């Protein structure tokens, strides 16, 4: 169906298209200019036009699509080359000598124009928005032939047919950008006037009136330029294109569309990304980072693995980070890319990194500050046994396990403190970090008194082995100790941050007194790091440090196989168990340890399994660890968690191979590596390790950690601006003054190590193993049906835990306190009492005593996220407004902070202050346009996107990123910012800003829906009784748009 009109625009005769149709209604019609009949035709749709057009005589096919500027449209280019030679009927060929343009140089220029279009597209859309354009997405048509004057004319249309822009202004601006990048001699060939507010553009199969040059598809051209071979007519149409992706608005102020999400590469990730460039950097140098792309400058010609040819001029190399994967791109070929690998924390990063270590393209040794000491203060050698120790005030010894550090220490003690020495009556204190390690040391130094075998003060004993937690039994005296020995010194420092000290203050005070005043100090550790150096320099800086380092690589005959695939690791384990090999399995995950135990028991019921974890009884740990030679000699499989580390050593050659499973959610890399050495001799010297860990963003330097720590306390002294949620210092409390005690400095050093492990767990683990001299390879293997069964067992274990807790005895506060005290003091607690204690803690947390609970209740409400969200909701809804709630929380935490600084600083540093996290979360919410966590208002897409752009362009989210350990988003990408904000709201309150049918509102996450805000207590489930006053709805969205999933119904339950 069609209608015809003489004119397009309105006139007094009523014969124009606009007399009948508004611009809005023309969106759904197809308008054609009929040049032959000098008419405008309006068709109901495109199909009607194609059907009608097919029946028209050839000479009348002079049709042009009418493109209205306000409608979305494809990007298009009209290319015309000047006429060079007349044709006559009897002369079919151009005189090449007189011709300026022939097929070859026309094609060269056309190829140049296509390249520039792709380059500008890359710069405009690929770089900031990760939207790629390939040659196969470019449609090339031609109308080559004789014009009205019988002259040869080259004419082409270039159409980017898979994409559209919002309007003609966007198209015009993009075309201008292309023209700016064309060489001057090419510029005249491109028509700049093809993006007017009303544009006629010739339709495929049509010609101009009086000319036989028909616009057509050209298969030969498509082959030459490697462009699209489509012959679908609708792909050539410009206006309101269907099946296209609408590109972001770049050149106009319209905010209806938003860019696709692409994260910005963080500075902390850049070094890791650059490592993937590897040998490519021989011909390129780093240029800059643009969002998720790393750009390089060419320094010399090189072979391109993507294009399979040499490039010698352009800056073609680009690395793109999508998610955590790193891809290599070439500007000359947008169709292909090479996966280089993945950043830390992703599934195939392990294999990629091991491959780089195997090819020695990675430096695995991490230098420490001790190595920078002058030659007069260090003794470095490479021998299979230890040399004699120096008699110096501060001696630091580094060497791998089983090279004889303790043997040489005994020789040192015999020489300087033996019966024939002048110092035989001098005081010696040997400090250890674990009770079992203390007993192990005593077996080697029988003339020392073990702290646990005597009662009362330890000062009367000249030679004492004492665990860190029992240092309070020593006192400072007028005379310092003569020799202080710190074996496994890094672990000793860790132990001061364990939270297990019953008498922390006196224990740490006596430790620091001995460290600062002892005549001689010896520190020993295979994993010696900068923490020890910094602590010694700070507190024993008046005497020089002497570094004794035996670099002998005892592990050079060991072989490690790494993988990130649990399936590959399990299949190898199963294969070795089927071959009746005896296996050692250390893991830093209690759940994984329990899962492996159940999995192996079901598969191999005849095998004996030794299992040790924090859940093992105190009696079992003490009896077994004191006689591992006997007890471990009875088992086929040995599974243990960090409960076993230094101090427990099995020397017999019983076990064949070690299978380790580690992640970055538990202890640090150094502790994990220590766990590998508890069985000293493996028959095969083979270690098969599965490493897993998500990407984290913890502050890594002492300066950043200190800034973040002080900032959290700083905000407690500031006055909140109710309107802008910003801070000013209170006149009453003033600006805080912090006293940086010895423990404060030790705590900072310990946090640095923990954060490095959380952020770079996989690389640090592999580096430390490779640095021992061990050979590293990638673990491979056949795929068997084990993972589904493994996962099923995991669910069974979790469900049984839920059942045990739900069905446990309901105990009172007195019994719960007794169980807690027994656990703290290492007294064995019955398993049923442990479940009863877990049940009590769960009921106490939600104030849910007196209610019967089910396994499903335990599953839902005993999760970390649900508890964290519940705490956040309770804290933010105590007052009548969020401002009042924030002020109440600030006052509470400030009072605790001031008490802790006066009485027990370690409590302050270990306390999780939450005020600042609330402050940031509410600030983000208000910047989005919502007043509080229970705001029922609805924002349109335009309202929210405008807020995100206007509010966050100048706002630095670094502090918020630090607070929530999240990657900082790109400030120019609203969708990425919203994703970041929703992560914050989800972590703090179990909320998100939800999108539905073009509107945004506050909605519960899955965890948040379990703990609704209510006006008064309900009986059905735990809830948050909120004091927040209702927010008046001010949204312009009609009431009926609130569905059953609206924020009002989800975030506030009336009783």
Swiss-Prot record:
Per its UniProt entry, which superkingdom is the organism in? Viruses
The alphabetized list of GO BP terms reads:
DNA replication
GO MF, one example: ATP binding
This protein's UniProt keywords: DNA replication, Early protein
Give yes or no: UniProt keyword Ligase. no
**Which InterPro entries does this entry report, sorted A to Z?**
P-loop_NTPase (IPR027417), Replication_origin-bd (IPR003450)
Q: What induces it?
A: Expressed in the early phase of the viral replicative cycle.
Query: What does this gene product do?
Result: May be involved in DNA replication.
Query: What family does the Swiss-Prot or TrEMBL record give for this protein?
Result: Belongs to the asfivirus F1055L family.
Name recorded for this polypeptide: Putative helicase/primase complex protein
What species was this sequence derived from? African swine fever virus (strain Badajoz 1971 Vero-adapted)
